[in-house]
């Protein structure tokens, strides 16, 4: 009878550890997916840094400038 309780206790402990590990793994995967989703470009009406642009029709975001010398959106320092 004692052996049966020990086996049942070990089985219960195994199930508890397994569920705990699955919870931890799923929360870790959620954190990783949110972290990498932040790197994905978002849709916006203006062009971000290093985006190719036309000086005549600059669609760069505020604080970025597009010039003839540098036909890409770059940070506009001091203005």
Curated annotation (Swiss-Prot):
Cleaved propeptide residues: 20-44
Task: Tell where it localizes.
Answer: Secreted
Disulfide bond entries: 46-61, 53-66, 60-73
Q: Which GO terms describe its molecular function?
A: ion channel inhibitor activity; toxin activity
Alphabetic keyword roster: Amidation, Disulfide bond, Ion channel impairing toxin, Knottin, Secreted, Signal, Toxin
Give the residues annotated as coiled coil.
none
Checking Pfam families in the record gives: Conotoxin (PF02950)
Gene Ontology CC terms: extracellular region
The family database entries (SUPFAM superfamilies) matched by this protein are listed as: omega toxin-like
The keyword Transit peptide is annotated on this UniProt entry: no
Query: Where, by tissue, is this protein expressed?
Result: Expressed by the venom gland.
Q: What is known of its domains?
A: The presence of a 'disulfide through disulfide knot' structurally defines this protein as a knottin.
User: What family does this belong to?
Assistant: Belongs to the neurotoxin 03 (Tx2) family. 01 subfamily.
Function as written in the Swiss-Prot or TrEMBL entry? Probable ion channel inhibitor. Shows insecticidal activity when injected into mealworms.
Q: What is this protein called?
A: Orally active insecticidal peptide
């Amino acid at each position: 009878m004692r052996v049966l309780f020990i086996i049942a206790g070990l089985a219960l402990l195994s199930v508890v550890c397994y569920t705990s590990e699955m919870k931890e793994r799923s929360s870790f995967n959620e954190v990783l997916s949110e972290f990498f989703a932040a790197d994905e470009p978002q849709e916006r009406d203006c062009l971000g840094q290093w985006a190719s642009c036309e000086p005549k029709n600059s669609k760069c975001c505020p604080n970025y400038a597009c010039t003839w010398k540098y036909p890409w959106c770059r940070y506009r320092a001091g203005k």
